[in-house]
């Protein structure tokens, strides 16, 4: 793995993340009958870079009562994990070809909980701590359904390797035979990334800004960068699992174009949901998971396990 390969992966992700922030502000603006950012550069296209310059040149203030080490480590860890999640994704070739790529993504995304918990605790603020506890409970809860849904799709894929998902979906998207799982997966990714209508961790009316309330300047920017990278990564993963694109060695650029288009459409749906839906109550959020999603996903998992046995066949051993 050369440095050039690493840069060719990281730089486009950072650019995509910057323009996702701008796109969200534009969509929010137009949905509220206003223009959104339109001053810096043509049509406001340079706004993300202006924001980055402003945030990274400001003085990073630290509360005098905070635990400095964890306070600084938390945003850095959040961004590192957000970037690390991209390494096994085949687009069409992965940076690191892991046999257990899906397991790596699931395990690494669980580590993001620590950055949220540390930031809430180290800030020494009640608002930040309550926001962090909410975010951690929500993230851990929804990872249960994400893991079960992944296991169900892996039974049809026959491997933990993400590259084999491309071969599995050559003739049929997994979205069609597993559409209930796909719907629950998409809603769970909204909760996993703390997006509306599941953004209880940063409820402005009761918690001001949630776990990052005491952060300013560069560290705050790192949290936002990690959040938007996770959104793109989750939609990329959704595209791979349920909307697989057939790879043709003679025209690899066609795979990339189709892949990016599907990911962009799913990301736009994330933003559209933010503009259209109000926030859930916290008890409704937890009931949706433990009383609805968990029994449903377990029942469907049993169905996908028993079905090959019933029809006397086995999943493809790729």
UniProtKB/Swiss-Prot annotation:
Lineage of origin: Eukaryota, Metazoa, Chordata, Craniata, Vertebrata
Chief location category: mitochondrion
Subcellular location per the Swiss-Prot or TrEMBL entry: Mitochondrion inner membrane
Example GO molecular function: NADH dehydrogenase (ubiquinone) activity
Signal peptide: none
Protein name: NADH-ubiquinone oxidoreductase chain 1
Annotated source species: Gorilla gorilla gorilla (Western lowland gorilla)
One GO cellular component term noted in the UniProt record for this chain: respiratory chain complex I
Superkingdom of origin organism: Eukaryota
Subunit structure: Core subunit of respiratory chain NADH dehydrogenase (Complex I) which is composed of 45 different subunits.
Catalytically driven reaction(s): a ubiquinone + NADH + 5 H(+)(in) = a ubiquinol + NAD(+) + 4 H(+)(out)
EC number in record: 7.1.1.2
């Amino acid at each position: 793995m050369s440095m050039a390969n690493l840069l060719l992966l990281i730089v486009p992700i950072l650019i995509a993340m910057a323009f996702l922030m701008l796109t969200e502000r534009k969509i929010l603006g137009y949905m509220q009958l206003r223009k959104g950012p339109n001053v810096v550069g043509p049509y406001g296209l340079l706004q993300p870079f202006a924001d980055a310059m402003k945030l990274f040149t400001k003085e990073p203030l630290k509360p005098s009562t905070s635990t400095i080490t964890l306070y600084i480590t938390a945003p850095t860890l959040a961004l590192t994990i957000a970037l690390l999640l991209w390494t096994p994704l085949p687009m069409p070739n992965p940076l690191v070809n892991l046999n257990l790529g899906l397991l790596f993504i699931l395990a690494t995304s669980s580590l993001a909980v620590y950055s949220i918990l540390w930031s809430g605790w180290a800030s020494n603020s009640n608002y930040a701590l309550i926001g962090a506890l909410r975010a951690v409970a929500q993230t851990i809860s929804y990872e249960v359904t994400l893991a079960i849904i992944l296991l169900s799709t892996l039974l049809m894929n026959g491997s933990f390797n993400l590259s084999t998902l491309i071969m599995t979906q050559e003739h049929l998207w997994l979205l069609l035979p597993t559409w209930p799982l796909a719907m629950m997966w998409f809603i769970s990714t909204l909760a996993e990334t703390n997006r509306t209508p599941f953004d209880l961790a940063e409820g402005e009316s009761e918690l001001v800004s949630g776990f990052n309330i005491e952060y300013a300047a560069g560290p705050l920017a790192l949290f936002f960068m990690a959040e938007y990278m996770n959104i793109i990564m989750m939609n990329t993963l959704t595209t791979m699992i349920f909307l697989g694109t057939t790879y043709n060695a003679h025209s690899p650029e066609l795979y990339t174009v189709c892949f990016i288009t599907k990911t962009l459409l799913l990301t736009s749906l994330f933003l559209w949901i933010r503009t259209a839906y109000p926030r859930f109550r916290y008890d409704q959020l937890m009931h949706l998971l433990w009383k609805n999603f968990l029994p449903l996903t377990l029942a469907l998992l049993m169905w996908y396990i028993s079905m090959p046995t019933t029809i006397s066949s086995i999943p493809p051993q790729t």
